[in-house]
Each structure stands twice: as C-alpha cells, then as structure tokens.
C-alpha cells in the first residue's frame, strides 16, 4: 500500500551557512562597525546580539534574506522576546522549529479524515504517515495538506509503493 510521511524539518546545514554569511556581512558593513552586533547558531537556536533593538531588527532582516537566498523557509523561525543583557546590549533568541507538534499533527489528521479521501493518517512521533490504496489519492492528500496548513513549512518524504 503506498504511503508517505509529512514532516517539518529544516535543512540545518543551510541554516548554519546562512547564519555564517550573516555574521560575515555584519563584520563588513559600515553601519555595524564598532557595535556589539553579532549572530550565532547553537543547537537549533540562533542568538542575535546588538546595542539596541533596531540593530536586532537589521540583523534579523539580513538573516531572513540569507535564509531565503539559500531556499530555507523563514516559517521555521520562532522568535523569542528581546532581553536586556549587561550594559546597554540586547539579545534575542530565535528557535529553529523541527518536527510537527502534537496539536498540529492532530489538525492534519483531522483535515485528512474530514476530506473523505480514501487515505488514512497516523501520527508517528514528530511526523504524520499518510497511507492510501492509490497514488492519486496520496497526491490529492498532499495538495489538501499544503492548502489547509499554510502556517507550517511541511515537506513530504519516505514515499513507499
């Protein structure tokens, strides 16, 4: 029986490259000379540091541009609050989402079941497996998921025939 998995996983090497390119651009830009502006990636968390909140906005704009250039969906980013750290510096942590949360997985299975397609959806950890008798039904399920869940960067893998 044909099946596929619906997952939400970023291309982490490309995220790392985008963060490194952002750090290089910060180091060479004239408006960041002599400031504490920095960006770094540690364990699926991007930390941005700046002298003021407007600098964090500029660093985030650069980061988003670099991610987009490297074909990484910016919906993977989950911004945290701006925190004041020692002196007059501010910091913001951006988490890189990975995996489908349980309530999102339940939403996807509910969408599949309500669609009356001849497919079954099962939650398996941080992925949703869709199984059906025909390949056409699976393709219809893919189109339905992409249309009805626009707020998550979902991808489909592990196709079985």
Swiss-Prot record:
GO terms for cellular component: cytosol. Keywords: Nucleotide-binding. One of its GO terms (molecular function) is nucleotide binding. The keyword Metal-binding does not apply. InterPro entries: DUF520, UPF0234-like_C, YajQ-like_sf. Transmembrane segments: none annotated. Nucleotide-binding protein. Belongs to the YajQ family. PANTHER family: UPF0234 PROTEIN YAJQ. HAMAP family: YajQ. This is Nucleotide-binding protein Vapar_3769. The lineage of its organism: Bacteria, Pseudomonadati, Pseudomonadota, Betaproteobacteria, Burkholderiales.
């Amino acid at each position: 029986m044909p099946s596929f998995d619906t997952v939400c996983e970023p291309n982490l090497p490309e995220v790392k490259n985008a963060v490194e390119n952002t750090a290089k651009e910060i180091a060479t830009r004239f408006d960041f000379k002599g400031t504490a502006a920095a960006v770094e990636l540690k364990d699926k968390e991007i930390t941005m540091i700046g002298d003021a909140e407007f600098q964090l906005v500029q660093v985030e704009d650069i980061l988003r541009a670099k991610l987009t250039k490297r074909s990484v969906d910016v919906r993977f980013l989950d911004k945290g609050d701006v925190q004041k750290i020692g002196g007059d510096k501010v910091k913001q942590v951006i988490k890189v989402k990975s995996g489908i949360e349980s309530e999102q997985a339940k939403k996807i299975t509910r969408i599949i079941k309500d669609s009356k397609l001849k497919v079954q959806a099962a939650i398996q950890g941080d992925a949703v497996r869709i199984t059906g008798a025909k390949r056409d039904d699976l393709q219809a399920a893919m189109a339905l998921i992409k249309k009805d869940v626009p707020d998550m960067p979902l991808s489909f893998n592990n196709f079985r025939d």
